[in-house]
Amino acid sequence: MQLLNIYNTLAREKQPFVPIEPGKVRMYVCGMTVYDYCHVGHARVMVVFDMVHRWLRAAGYDVTFVQNITDIDDKIIRRAAENGETIGQLTTRFIQYMHEDADALGIVRPDHEPRATDYVPQMLDLIGKLEANGLAYQATDGDVNYSVRKFDGYGKLSGKSLEDLRAGERVTANDAKQDPLDFVLWKSAKESEPPESKWNSKWGMGRPGWHIECSAMSCTLLGEHFDIHGGGADLQFPHHENEIAQSEGASGKPFVNVWMHNGFVRVNDEKMSKSLGNFFTIREVLKEYDAEVVRFFILRAHYRSPLNYSDAHLDDARHALTRLYTALKDTQPGGYAVDWEEAHAKRFAEAMCDDFNTPIAVSVLFDLASEVNRTGSSVAARQLKGLAGTLGLLERDPHTFLQGGKKVDGPSPDEIEGLIAARKTAKAERNFAEADRIRADLLAAGIVLEDKPGGATEWRRA
């Protein structure tokens, strides 16, 4: 297989991927803050890094994949108080919902899914190292802050100097900070906050800042220097910049070799956000569309490109995925093993090894589907199913998918079968006008009938 090249945000270019330990990859991806339902932006992070995880394994790497859960922060404390429940009750419920969404989207569970509240001792240890290295200080308000001016490499991920960052970023004024860009490592507790949101430390009762959580969990589980760190583009600054400052400031070692960031999800060319009111949860979308359609919609775009969300784009993805499943419906492809020496597989691998170029990889799947339709080749069908499987696609029985589709009001499977039986009776009675009417009515309802040799009729949703 070809050498893998990945766009490294830190270097601002594609680079050959060379793991720290030959044959092994250690990867960390920033996960969810569990106080609300996951939205389509979260779905993109899930699917993109699941795709990366799957391809690394397909390429023969032994992957250790860590994705954290943020189960303590201001929003969580606030939401639990609003609901009149404990923080644990709130986060447990939304972790379950997150897992349900991820499972529906075909996400392979990470090897480790650390919760921030289980790693507070490691966070305190890391803050202590930063203080000992002269990079952290306790402010007059009780918070422990990171002193960005004392870390020479601050800004290297975003490519901005401290002066640029101070001028261009919205930084909340705080007289207790030595620099407006300084960020909280340990947040001093307030009397009004619940006991389960506070831990004891040498700096007093409090809780960890958001950024220190990821540094502590990633370094504990993957080591102080690991291969890949991923997340959404919105995390590049300040979150990932601050992770670098914390981790390298404590260890004196390079933190991560390759930084990967997926692009935003946009609605009508605006970033999806609650404030703009163009916000869709995964659950809302899955009421309307099959989960594999949503996964396919995400994978048709390059992971670094903006992804424009609309019903029209999802409908187009549904039709396209239907074409792929239709190519497999009359074949018995057997096993899923890929022949990587075959021409289509080589093109597919070349695309995936070029910074995970899924649009090109998906185009290879359509080329294979055309060959299956043209020749009925079981070899091509096996390749189609096997290659798609590396993307988490085409893993269901084709007929199951083809009789699903968009989840809208329409005839149920039993109603469709009843109408097919009525059409068969009409044809037997030579009432072809009635048979044609039934076919036309079903087509208007989005149901396509296909008459097979021997008198059988199959159906699928358009």
Curated annotation (Swiss-Prot):
Binds 1 zinc ion per subunit. Keywords: Aminoacyl-tRNA synthetase, ATP-binding, Cytoplasm, Ligase, Metal-binding, Nucleotide-binding, Protein biosynthesis, Zinc. CDD domains: Anticodon_Ia_Cys, CysRS_core. Its main location: cytoplasm. ATP binds at K274. A motif ('KMSKS' region) lies at residues 271-275. GO terms for cellular component: cytosol. Zn(2+) binds at C30, C214, H239, E243. One of its GO terms (molecular function) is zinc ion binding. GO terms for biological process: cysteinyl-tRNA aminoacylation. It is found in: Cytoplasm. SUPFAM superfamilies: Anticodon-binding domain of a subclass of class I aminoacyl-tRNA synthetases (SSF47323), Nucleotidylyl transferase (SSF52374). It catalyses: tRNA(Cys) + L-cysteine + ATP = L-cysteinyl-tRNA(Cys) + AMP + diphosphate. Its cofactor is Zn(2+). It comes from the Bacteria. Its EC number is 6.1.1.16. A motif ('HIGH' region) lies at residues 32-42. Pfam families: CysS_C, DALR_2, tRNA-synt_1e. InterPro entries: Cys-tRNA-ligase, Cys-tRNA-synt_Ia_DALR, Cys-tRNA/MSH_ligase, CysS_C, Rossmann-like_a/b/a_fold, tRNA-synt_1_cat_dom, tRNAsynth_Ia_anticodon-bd. Monomer. HAMAP family: Cys_tRNA_synth (MF_00041). Belongs to the class-I aminoacyl-tRNA synthetase family. This is Cysteine--tRNA ligase. It comes from Cupriavidus pinatubonensis (strain JMP 134 / LMG 1197) (Cupriavidus necator (strain JMP 134)). The gene is cysS.
